Swiss-Prot record:
<keyword id="KW-0464">Manganese</keyword>
<keyword id="KW-0479">Metal-binding</keyword>
<dbReference type="GO" id="GO:0009234">
    <property type="term" value="P:menaquinone biosynthetic process"/>
</dbReference>
<dbReference type="Pfam" id="PF02776">
    <property type="entry name" value="TPP_enzyme_N"/>
</dbReference>
<dbReference type="InterPro" id="IPR011766">
    <property type="entry name" value="TPP_enzyme_TPP-bd"/>
</dbReference>
<keyword id="KW-0474">Menaquinone biosynthesis</keyword>
<comment type="pathway">
    <text>Quinol/quinone metabolism; 1,4-dihydroxy-2-naphthoate biosynthesis; 1,4-dihydroxy-2-naphthoate from chorismate: step 2/7.</text>
</comment>
<keyword id="KW-0786">Thiamine pyrophosphate</keyword>
<dbReference type="Pfam" id="PF02775">
    <property type="entry name" value="TPP_enzyme_C"/>
</dbReference>
<dbReference type="Pfam" id="PF16582">
    <property type="entry name" value="TPP_enzyme_M_2"/>
</dbReference>
<keyword id="KW-0808">Transferase</keyword>
<comment type="pathway">
    <text>Quinol/quinone metabolism; menaquinone biosynthesis.</text>
</comment>
<comment type="function">
    <text>Catalyzes the thiamine diphosphate-dependent decarboxylation of 2-oxoglutarate and the subsequent addition of the resulting succinic semialdehyde-thiamine pyrophosphate anion to isochorismate to yield 2-succinyl-5-enolpyruvyl-6-hydroxy-3-cyclohexene-1-carboxylate (SEPHCHC).</text>
</comment>
<dbReference type="GO" id="GO:0030145">
    <property type="term" value="F:manganese ion binding"/>
</dbReference>
<comment type="subunit">
    <text>Homodimer.</text>
</comment>
<protein>
    <recommendedName>
        <fullName>2-succinyl-5-enolpyruvyl-6-hydroxy-3-cyclohexene-1-carboxylate synthase</fullName>
        <ecNumber>2.2.1.9</ecNumber>
    </recommendedName>
</protein>
<dbReference type="GO" id="GO:0000287">
    <property type="term" value="F:magnesium ion binding"/>
</dbReference>
Length: 560
């Protein structure tokens, strides 16, 4: 019987076993060697298939789907450099915890290292970046179906975070008629598994949450709560929990905590704030990937008696290497096990400092249309019952420092490796998972880097506005002590482009806004009318970085 038919049976079983572990979305790039996987995914009614012609963007599309759905997402690509293009998304997932199941089709062993076309060494292709890897053999009916499903089940049961790389060699022929009866006995050997929804092998892993026995004593001390990347529900709970304790909470742009002490990356430069925070006896950090420069500096320099870092990702997440406790736990479960004890705030003056800072920023930016004003006013543009995706580089730092985002409002970003690749693709994946209106904001170089991902936005399930802040290059380098003589040529790299033609090429609406009123009205109209709009905001190249530096320099002069 045909090899192509058994390839299909093998791939059908592989895909079906993944659905038993919650895989609903599969992202597929075109390719011949991956034909058994692609056709099997298309035939599986439990799977939603997404396609993209660029594997780098495809990986980030899957990353966004996994980020928003909190479910494992599968990726199917062909052999060769197609598989290599998934590397950035796999690295990001390894750092931020999204579960990706990467199915790379491969040539059989006899075609490796002999000059065969599109054949590379795919064993351990992604080095240490996947959490797990499974190298499958060439499909053969001599291997029982129970081996394949139990191998997948075992790997998926251990995939708590990051990527699982499953390398899938297929021999030719890859195409051919399938009469539907061949090799059915191989599948039928699994019995009533086919009519169930359970994995073949159910591994039970129980990890009891370890309560800190001295928490009743520490919660009566002077504490500070730092919140990095957590979920909307966790951010809201943390805000209420810290408030009951009377502890100041400093929230990152991805904290979704409502940032009760807004503009922290500005007011942390005030000496009075530093003096008060120095009195903290315990610091609790929830989530990693802090953004703000002043916050990172304070976190590094603080010397409490105890430093606890709570996150469900394992490993070291504290670049300052504090002595303390690294607690691997779900944030919500940890809060339930460590209730607050109501007490009076010990650092009330920080509320006054933050309020004064926010008012001064309002005044400073009131008549200055530009990147900083846009960042500060982002909350006014958010769609009701929607979501925000924040790009990297300068824009995320400005929003982190200047805006106060609503508590519990979903905010997404790629702050693991913090690259500018794949941001639009990730945004597209997030929205496909939620089907909610979305506001996205990226810089011009980020948009150029992922320009062909505009093709993914044509299938947006809800209104979407993508703001491209065009400051003509990588102006994050204007914040850094890069050599002035070489800054433009070798760091900022201005491209002198506008995005109207790109939007037209992909059939997207396009607006260029030159003032706040036009920008705000355009966004409001988009939420009402639907569709996808690329909104380009051309700003003075150095204005955003210069404004941030000005505000940090001035904060010490503001009386509180």
């Amino acid at each position: 019987m045909s090899t192509s038919v058994f390839n299909r049976r093998w791939a059908t079983l592989l895909l079906e076993s993944l659905t038993r572990h919650g895989v609903r979305h599969v992202c597929i790039a075109p390719g011949s060697r991956s034909t058994p996987l692609t056709l099997s995914a298309a035939d599986n009614h439990a799977l939603i298939c997404h396609t993209h012609f660029d594997e780098r963007g495809l990986g980030h599309l899957a990353l966004g789907l996994a980020k928003a759905s909190r479910e494992p997402v599968a990726i199917i690509v062909t052999s060769g450099t197609a598989a290599a293009n998934l590397y950035p998304a796999i690295i990001e997932a390894g750092l931020t915890g999204e579960r990706l199941v990467v199915l790379t089709a491969d040539r059989p062993p006899e075609l490796i290292d002999c000059g065969a076309n599109q054949a590379i060494r795919q064993h351990a292709l992604y080095a240490s970046h996947p959490t797990l890897a499974l190298d499958l053999p060439r499909p053969t009916p001599d291997i029982p179906a129970s081996w394949l499903v139990s191998s997948v089940d075992s790997a998926m049961a251990r995939l708590a975070h990051g990527a699982l790389h499953i390398n899938c060699p297929f021999a030719e022929p890859l195409y051919g008629a399938d009469d539907g009866t061949a090799y059915q006995d191989w599948l039928i050997a699994l019995g009533d598994w086919w009519s169930s929804r359970e994995p073949w092998l159910r591994e039970m892993r129980q990890s009891a949450l370890a309560e800190q026995p001295d928490w009743p004593q520490w919660r009566q001390k002077r504490g500070v709560v730092l919140v990095g990347r957590v979920s909307p529900e966790q951010g809201a709970r943390l805000a209420a929990w810290a408030n009951e304790l009377g502890w100041p909470l400093i929230g990152d742009v991805l904290s979704q905590s409502g940032q009760p002490l807004p503009c922290a990356d500005i007011w942390l430069a005030h000496p009075d704030a530093a003096d008060r925070l120095r009195q903290a006896e315990i610091v609790l950090q929830f989530g990693g990937s802090l953004t703000g420069k002043r916050l990172l500096q304070w976190q590094e320099q603080c010397q409490p008696q105890e430093f606890w870092l709570i996150d469900d990702l394992p490993g070291r997440l504290d670049p300052a290497h504090h002595r303390g406790r690294r607690l691997v736990a779900d944030v919500g479960e940890w809060l339930s096990a460590h209730p607050a004890h109501k007490q009076a705030p010990w650092a009330d003056m920080l509320v006054d400092i933050a309020d004064k800072t926010q008012r001064q920023i309002d005044t400073h930016l009131a008549s200055r249309f530009g990147e900083a004003q846009l960042a500060q006013r982002i909350p006014a543009l958010l769609p009701p019952d929607g979501q925000l995706f924040v790009g990297n580089s300068l824009v995320v730092r400005l929003i982190d420092a200047l805006a106060q985002l609503p508590q519990g409002y979903p905010v997404y970003g790629n702050r693991g490796a913090s690259g500018i690749d794949g941001l639009i693709s990730t945004l597209a994946g997030v929205q496909r998972a939620t089907a909610k209106p979305m506001l996205g904001i990226v810089g011009d170089l980020s948009a150029l880097y992922d320009l062909n991902a505009l093709a993914l936005l044509r299938q947006a399930p809800a209104p979407l506005v993508l703001i491209v802040v065009n400051n003509n290059g990588g102006q994050i380098f204007s914040l850094l002590p890069t050599p002035v003589a070489q800054r433009e040529t070798f760091y900022c790299m201005p491209q002198n482009v506008e995005f109207g033609h790109a939007a037209a090429m992909f059939g997207l609406n396009y607006v260029r806004a030159d003032n706040w009123e036009q920008l705000a009205n355009t966004v409001t109209d988009c939420w009402a009318q639907g569709g996808v709009t690329l909104l380009e905001v051309v700003v003075e190249p150095k204005d955003g970085a210069a404004t941030l530096n000005e505000l940090v320099a001035q904060v010490a002069t503001w009386a509180h």
